[in-house]
């Protein structure tokens, strides 16, 4: 029996095959916004996340326009949008809607395994593409990262353990994302940020922490570890006061 990640990647292969049948990438170039610039100060990347394999439905009927507008008003430095439909109940339409509403950098959060998905994300308005080391061979990761650069976009290269980190460092990417969630089991351990962050600080690389940040105390932990930003989804999608969450993010360490 495969892991959750294996199931997701199998589904992506089907989606990619369908895209090649139904989608023709546009050639026009457009203006993009920089996450690297946003990370010059500690930044919250606020996520639109309707559901997940581990939690089921989180906020299925969220008004994407309203959510994104609130994020921007509260001080988010970037917005992340889940575009996976099968497991996270997102869509490229959600990404496009966010782009229409937002003037800050926009991350396409998906399991990218092929260039055509990057083309689709670009057309929908993404500025940043997530590339997950655990979902790709070294060769494919390098190929997709090069394509991101060719499109004039930025990448977050996501890692969960030391082995994946070594692969990511070789690319010298724009941003490395430490995912505190193990994509094989979907369990979360915030100490991954502290463990892997030490190496990234030594390498003087730009990095963020992803998943598992729910409180002021969690925010202090990731800031102390040296993260330049944090990606927050579930905590914001279920929050009764997004404004209060952002105020808590302003803690000094």
UniProtKB/Swiss-Prot annotation:
Pathway: Amino-acid biosynthesis; L-tryptophan biosynthesis; L-tryptophan from chorismate: step 4/5. Gene3D superfamilies: Aldolase class I (3.20.20.70). It is an enzyme of class 4 (lyase). InterPro entries: Aldolase_TIM, Indole-3-glycerol_P_synth, Indole-3-glycerol_P_synth_dom, Indole-3-GlycerolPSynthase_CS, RibuloseP-bd_barrel. The keyword Thylakoid does not apply. One of its GO terms (molecular function) is indole-3-glycerol-phosphate synthase activity. Belongs to the TrpC family. NCBIfam families: PRK00278.1-3 (NF001371), PRK00278.2-4 (NF001377). This is Indole-3-glycerol phosphate synthase. It comes from Bacillus cereus (strain ZK / E33L).
């Amino acid at each position: 029996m495969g892991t959750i990640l294996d199931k997701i990647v199998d589904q992506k292969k089907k989606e990619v095959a369908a895209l090649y049948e139904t989608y023709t990438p546009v050639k026009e170039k457009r203006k993009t916004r920089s996450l690297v610039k946003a990370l010059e100060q500690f930044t919250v990347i606020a996520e639109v996340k309707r559901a997940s394999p581990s939690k089921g439905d989180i906020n299925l009927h969220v008004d994407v326009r309203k959510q994104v507008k609130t994020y921007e008003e509260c001080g988010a430095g970037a917005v992340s949008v889940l575009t996976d439909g099968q497991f996270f109940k997102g869509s490229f339409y959600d990404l496009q809607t966010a782009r229409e509403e937002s003037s800050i950098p926009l991350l396409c959060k998906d399991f990218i395994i092929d260039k055509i998905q990057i083309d689709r994300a670009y057309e929908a308005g993404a500025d940043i593409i997530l590339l997950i080391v655990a979902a790709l061979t070294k060769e494919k990761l390098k190929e997709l990262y090069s394509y991101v650069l060719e499109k004039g976009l930025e990448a977050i290269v996501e890692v969960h353990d030391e082995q994946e980190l070594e692969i990511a460092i070789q690319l010298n990417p724009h941003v490395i994302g430490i995912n505190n969630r193990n994509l094989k089991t979907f369990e979360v351990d915030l100490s991954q940020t502290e463990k892997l962050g030490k190496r990234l600080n030594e390498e003087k690389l730009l990095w963020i922490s992803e998943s598992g940040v729910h409180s002021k105390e969690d925010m202090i932990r990731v800031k102390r570890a040296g993260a330049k930003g944090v990606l927050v989804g579930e905590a914001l999608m279920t929050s009764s006061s997004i404004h209060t969450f952002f105020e808590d993010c302003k803690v000094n360490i």
